[in-house]
């Protein structure tokens, strides 16, 4: 679970910004609280209030720790342009089964780490300074890595430990594995002037292919019908790719060519909703919130 996130000098965040997920001083609905942290929430604000950039900041971690899909084009102009500081700083705080995990690092662009540190229950277990090329790992089972960790490789040392060691079966290492698993199952998706996602999986599967390949086309039709969108959907293959088409008497049309912007956003929402069965651990979406909230309000008991 996320406890806290802090970012500084990344894109619009000239000064340090902290987003706290602890529920200590607030009265929230109990169903959105887990391990005393907020597990579900909405961040809203006027246009240009940095909501999208906050999402990119939170998901910066997947760039160097995972092999998942990445929105690298969104990380142009990485550093804040009003700040003379040439370093962006990130700090993530998690809690897994009562154990605190703090991961922090600095970068000067999306792909270049300057330093990183991982602590479990206030004990620093991995550290590396990429400028001085010095560091260490204290996790049991990584002894041999200490001979090669101080190299010129730009790879995250946390990622290096995860990919190249057989960790001993102890509580500290289990917490480390839960941290890696959490980051590997984070997902950001959006639908604004274009659709995209990063984290959780790889590839460019279309929404139509994803729904059809999951065997969910009839359920997707029912999903839309319950909202009052009376489409009769069918699968149609075009140039070797599966597409969703709408049938109208003796005619048919590509769903995504006739659907409204709001309906397309619902299709995107549904695409990722049916994947939540695969245990997405952290989800951030930036799409037509009004449409989704109206759906939830109208069909909350469905």
What do the predicted segments below correspond to?
Residues 1-65, 247-302:
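Switch/communication elements of ASCE P-loop NTPase nucleotide-binding domains
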Residues 4, 67-277:
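Phosphate-coordinating catalytic segments in nucleotide- and nucleic-acid-processing enzymes
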């Amino acid at each position: 679970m996320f406890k806290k996130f802090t970012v500084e000098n990344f894109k619009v965040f000239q000064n340090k910004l902290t987003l706290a997920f602890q529920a200590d001083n607030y009265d929230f609905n109990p169903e959105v609280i887990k391990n005393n942290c907020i597990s579900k929430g909405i961040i809203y604000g006027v246009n240009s209030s940095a909501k999208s950039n906050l999402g990119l900041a939170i998901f910066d971690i997947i760039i160097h720790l995972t092999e998942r899909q990445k929105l690298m084009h969104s990380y142009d102009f990485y550093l804040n342009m009003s700040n003379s500081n040439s370093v962006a700083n990130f700090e993530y705080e998690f809690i897994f089964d009562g154990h605190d995990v703090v991961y922090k690092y600095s970068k000067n662009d999306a792909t270049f780490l300057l330093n990183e540190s991982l602590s479990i229950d206030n004990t620093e277990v991995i550290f590396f300074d990429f400028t001085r090329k010095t560091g260490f790992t204290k996790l049991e089972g990584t002894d041999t890595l200490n001979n090669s960790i101080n190299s010129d490789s730009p790879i995250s040392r946390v990622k290096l430990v995860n990919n190249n060691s057989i960790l001993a079966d102890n509580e500290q290492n289990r917490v480390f594995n839960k941290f890696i698993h959490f980051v590997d199952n984070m997902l950001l998706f959006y639908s604004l002037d274009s659709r995209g996602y990063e984290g959780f999986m790889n590839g460019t599967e279309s929404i139509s292919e994803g729904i059809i390949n999951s065997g969910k086309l009839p359920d997707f039709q029912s999903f839309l019908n319950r909202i009052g969108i009376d489409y009769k959907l069918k699968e149609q293959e075009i140039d070797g790719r599966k597409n969703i088409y709408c049938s109208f008497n003796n005619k048919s049309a590509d769903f995504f060519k006739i659907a409204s912007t709001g309906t397309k956003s619902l299709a995107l929402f549904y695409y990722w909703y049916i994947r939540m069965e695969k245990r997405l651990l952290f989800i951030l979406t930036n799409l037509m919130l009004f449409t989704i909230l109206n759906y939830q309000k109208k069909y909350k008991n469905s």
